Amino acid sequence: MSKTYIGIDIAKNTFDACFITHNTWQNCTFTNNQQGFIELTLWIQAHHYNTSTLHLIIEATGAYWEKLAHWAISHHHKVSIVNPLYIHAYAKSLGIRTKTDKQDAILLARYGAKENPPLWQPKSDNEIKLTALLKQREHHKRQLIKERTRQEALSIYVKSYTDDNIRHWSDSITQLDHQIWQLINCTPELNYRASLLATIPGIGKKTLPHLLVVIGDGSSFQSAKHLASYAGLAPRHHQSGISIHKQSSIGFSGQKELRSALFMPAVIVSFGRYPAFQKFVKRMEQKGKTKKQIIIAIMRKLLTISYAVIRQNRPFDKRIHE
């Protein structure tokens, strides 16, 4: 039985849905709430489509897609969550410059039919809770940095007034760290994945929770390259003939918090403290890579190794990942 791909371009209050059949498309706009989700199903049924064959291709726009995705899963629909960068690249490959909500929904449906992206698996309740705790920790960390920066700019006579705020945010972060690890240790699947990730040189207690919430069981990513692209660590090359040859870079999109968490482990690895990565660092140096490029390459390598140990269900092995 063939699938029906439905592209969904979603915003805060509305979403556009489109499915393609016989080289024509049907398009409609719905409200991004429970009533809109019900109307989406009625609209599909009105076109005589079997809902069991539906495959929703939803663009990952902020957190606006989450309610619809969870609703679709609860109604036994197949769902894929697609990085907006992939759709942008796909549109570029087709020579499409127009950008409207309707056009994006059509593109998503076409992309789904062509690529058949991996199915999205909703996080468990404890994974959702872990994600929320990490977001809260990041917020408190930003507040702490802000207070410390503000204190540096204050007169020596009033600096003491910010001490209470600094202590408050510091204590709050300590409490959140305790809650994060208590949750990981008390959740069998999280604890097991954490034990695998902990075997990777350089991956410590601050980085590990971020890897857990992004990678999950790994099934949401087609490959390690897919994960690296999602995290904003995939290299971008700028070369054309002999006249354009820019230094490769990464796209600073995707998971900013994960990149921040991987940065310090990568810096430590770049100093040659871990024998398992010494050959890799040496190869980068021999290729004439800058210190920054080496650190980014190590961040990407740590991420791809993390994906491998979870997908292969076995701890880090120097012989394989060297």
Curated annotation (Swiss-Prot):
The keyword Transcription regulation does not apply. GO terms for molecular function: DNA binding; DNA strand exchange activity; transposase activity. GO terms for biological process: DNA transposition. Keywords: DNA invertase, DNA recombination, DNA-binding, Fimbrium biogenesis. InterPro entries: Transp_IS110-like_N, Transpos_IS110, Transposase_20. PANTHER family: PUTATIVE TRANSPOSASE FOR IS117-RELATED, TRANSPOSASE FOR INSERTION SEQUENCE ELEMENT IS1111A. May be the site-specific invertase required for pilin gene inversion. Moraxella can express either a Q or I pilin; the inversion of 2 kb of DNA determines which pilin is expressed. This is Pilin gene-inverting protein. It comes from Moraxella lacunata. The gene is piv.
